Amino acid sequence: MNWKDVHKNFSNYKLESVGREKEIISNRVTRTGLEFADFFVHKDLKAVVLWGNDEYLYLKQFDEKLVKEKIEKIFQLTPPLVVLSRSFPAKGIILELAKKYDISILSTKESSADLTNYINTFLTEKLSKKEYLHGNLIELFGLGVLLMGKSGLGKSETSIELIKHGHMFIADDAIVCSNVFNKIIGRAPKRFFGFLEVRGLGIINASRVFGIEKVKESTQINVIIELVEFDPKVHTFERLGKDLQYKEILGVKIPYYLIPITPGKKTSDMIEVIVAQLKLMLSGYNSFKEMEEKSMEDDDE
């Protein structure tokens, strides 16, 4: 991971200076406040440096010679990339020193607060530990659904039904999972983005078949639904829905449902009901508890 990867993702940021391709190690931007005050913790910088309004106002109080000295001390730490927000003009001394010390610089019209959020999220996803799972990933009613199960149970066919119902397709077969700020983000490997394999039909391009508006690059995984062949001797299925079951992905617990596949059951409809019910449960509503309360009221009468 170096400045080229950041610029590729944020291609609307202007490349002001092309420098060395030093590896970015940290998933957090640094504002170099301590370094500007001549307090140096590290001998080199391995994080993306972000300068905005605060840094600009700080440097503005000094004469040109002292400003040059302060910036030069930062650049001597060879940061892998410096990003300038809309409040920090990319001109003069900065560009001269960037060329001298072989530092890459990007400038943008974004605010420092937005930049911090965008870049930190991007770096966290790219640098975080990954887990690869087999399944399909669809977004329903704003929630990401990881559909799992053995081959031949109709995951892809179910995904097609859900897309036709207006839901979003993210990935088929291979799901790349990342822990981003304790949220599991799922996406397709780049080379498979937008493609869906259907048994008996082959590979289809979901964006071409269903429309580009039905395909999304990534989503948070909010629920795991596993499809299994119906066998009461092997599996125990939830009947009352009193409590949520969970499975872990990269240390994060995610609501989990085990759904039996039986003749005549339309799986896509079941999944829509599950997601709608889960949204209610996450908002504090529980159908079983309401039924239990009404049963107690009837007993009192």
Curated annotation (Swiss-Prot):
<comment type="function">
    <text>Catalyzes the ATP- as well as the pyrophosphate-dependent phosphorylation of a specific serine residue in HPr, a phosphocarrier protein of the phosphoenolpyruvate-dependent sugar phosphotransferase system (PTS). HprK/P also catalyzes the pyrophosphate-producing, inorganic phosphate-dependent dephosphorylation (phosphorolysis) of seryl-phosphorylated HPr (P-Ser-HPr).</text>
</comment>
<feature type="active site">
    <location>
        <position position="155"/>
    </location>
</feature>
<dbReference type="InterPro" id="IPR027417">
    <property type="entry name" value="P-loop_NTPase"/>
</dbReference>
<feature type="region of interest" description="Important for the catalytic mechanism of dephosphorylation">
    <location>
        <begin position="260"/>
        <end position="265"/>
    </location>
</feature>
<feature type="active site">
    <location>
        <position position="134"/>
    </location>
</feature>
<feature type="binding site">
    <location>
        <position position="156"/>
    </location>
    <ligand>
        <name>Mg(2+)</name>
    </ligand>
</feature>
<feature type="binding site">
    <location>
        <position position="197"/>
    </location>
    <ligand>
        <name>Mg(2+)</name>
    </ligand>
</feature>
<dbReference type="InterPro" id="IPR003755">
    <property type="entry name" value="HPr(Ser)_kin/Pase"/>
</dbReference>
<keyword id="KW-0547">Nucleotide-binding</keyword>
<dbReference type="GO" id="GO:0004712">
    <property type="term" value="F:protein serine/threonine/tyrosine kinase activity"/>
</dbReference>
<dbReference type="GO" id="GO:0006109">
    <property type="term" value="P:regulation of carbohydrate metabolic process"/>
</dbReference>
<keyword id="KW-0119">Carbohydrate metabolism</keyword>
<comment type="similarity">
    <text>Belongs to the HPrK/P family.</text>
</comment>
<dbReference type="GO" id="GO:0000155">
    <property type="term" value="F:phosphorelay sensor kinase activity"/>
</dbReference>
<keyword id="KW-0067">ATP-binding</keyword>
<keyword id="KW-0723">Serine/threonine-protein kinase</keyword>
<dbReference type="Pfam" id="PF02603">
    <property type="entry name" value="Hpr_kinase_N"/>
</dbReference>
<feature type="region of interest" description="Important for the catalytic mechanism of both phosphorylation and dephosphorylation">
    <location>
        <begin position="196"/>
        <end position="205"/>
    </location>
</feature>
<dbReference type="GO" id="GO:0000287">
    <property type="term" value="F:magnesium ion binding"/>
</dbReference>
<dbReference type="Pfam" id="PF07475">
    <property type="entry name" value="Hpr_kinase_C"/>
</dbReference>
<dbReference type="InterPro" id="IPR011104">
    <property type="entry name" value="Hpr_kin/Pase_C"/>
</dbReference>
<dbReference type="InterPro" id="IPR011126">
    <property type="entry name" value="Hpr_kin/Pase_Hpr_N"/>
</dbReference>
<protein>
    <recommendedName>
        <fullName>HPr kinase/phosphorylase</fullName>
        <ecNumber>2.7.11.-</ecNumber>
        <ecNumber>2.7.4.-</ecNumber>
    </recommendedName>
</protein>
<dbReference type="GO" id="GO:0004674">
    <property type="term" value="F:protein serine/threonine kinase activity"/>
</dbReference>
<feature type="active site" description="Proton acceptor; for phosphorylation activity. Proton donor; for dephosphorylation activity">
    <location>
        <position position="173"/>
    </location>
</feature>
<feature type="binding site">
    <location>
        <begin position="149"/>
        <end position="156"/>
    </location>
    <ligand>
        <name>ATP</name>
    </ligand>
</feature>
<keyword id="KW-0418">Kinase</keyword>
<dbReference type="InterPro" id="IPR028979">
    <property type="entry name" value="Ser_kin/Pase_Hpr-like_N_sf"/>
</dbReference>
<keyword id="KW-0460">Magnesium</keyword>
<dbReference type="GO" id="GO:0005524">
    <property type="term" value="F:ATP binding"/>
</dbReference>
<keyword id="KW-0808">Transferase</keyword>
<keyword id="KW-0511">Multifunctional enzyme</keyword>
<feature type="active site">
    <location>
        <position position="239"/>
    </location>
</feature>
<comment type="subunit">
    <text>Homohexamer.</text>
</comment>
<keyword id="KW-0479">Metal-binding</keyword>
